[in-house]
A protein has these predicted regions:
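Accessory substrate-recognition/RNA-binding modules or partner subunits associated with SAM-dependent
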Residues: 1-134, 151
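Conserved proline-anchored active-site loop of SAM-dependent methyltransferases
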Residues: 32, 138, 167
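Histidine (H) residue identity feature
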Residues: 60, 101, 139, 157-160
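C-terminal edge-of-domain segments
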Residues: 140-147
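Class I SAM-dependent transferase core
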Residues: 147-162
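Conserved small/polar residues in nucleotide/adenosyl-binding loops
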Residues: 163-169
């Protein structure tokens, strides 16, 4: 899994993950990767204070252009992740000379998923930018691509954390 964070908080996030019992913790740029089961994913979403999102990678691949991204995404068995009665959205983060516009990448991923379902079922899932049923994230660094399920939904900084101490007067 991948816990995204702000630059400079990677070490703190790694310590939080260690305290939660996560395994195989590796610090990266504005992220910390770790392994764990479904319970760990829920704990990470609920307990981590310095994480922005928890991503569950579903495919790593390389792509030199948008057509390769499309083909790689279309090759995924999407019925394992999404139904035609659900909505989805794609968030793209791109650091590449070839892929300059993240919106274009988002559209290519969306097109591949919609085309997959149309060919298999004759129907398509809906796209909803705000509050989709399934939020996907694609990260591209030059030619290295990672497609992930976003297990957090909204950014974790929007959680309503309740404190037991009285409010200041």
């Amino acid at each position: 899994m991948i816990a995204k964070t702000f630059q400079g908080l990677e070490e703190v996030l790694a310590q939080e993950l260690t305290a939660l019992g996560a395994n195989e913790i590796e610090i990266g740029r504005r992220m910390v990767s770790f392994s764990g089961d479904k319970e760990m994913m829920y704990k990470a979403n609920f307990c981590l204070r310095t994480a922005i999102r928890i991503l569950k990678p579903i495919k790593h691949f390389t792509a030199k252009d948008a057509d390769e991204v499309y083909e790689q995404i279309k090759a995924i068995r999407w019925e394992d992740y999404l139904d035609t009665d659900k909505t989805f959205a794609v968030d793209a983060v791109v650091f590449s000379e070839e892929f300059r516009h993240s919106k274009f990448v988002s559209y290519k991923v969306k097109d591949a998923i919609v085309d997959y379902f149309r060919e298999k079922t004759g129907e398509r899932p809906g796209v909803r930018v705000n509050k989709p049923d399934v939020l996907l994230n694609i990260h591209i660094a030059e030619t290295k691509c990672t497609l992930s399920l976003d297990s957090s939904g909204e950014s974790l900084h929007r959680r309503c954390l309740l404190y037991t101490s009285p409010s200041p007067r």
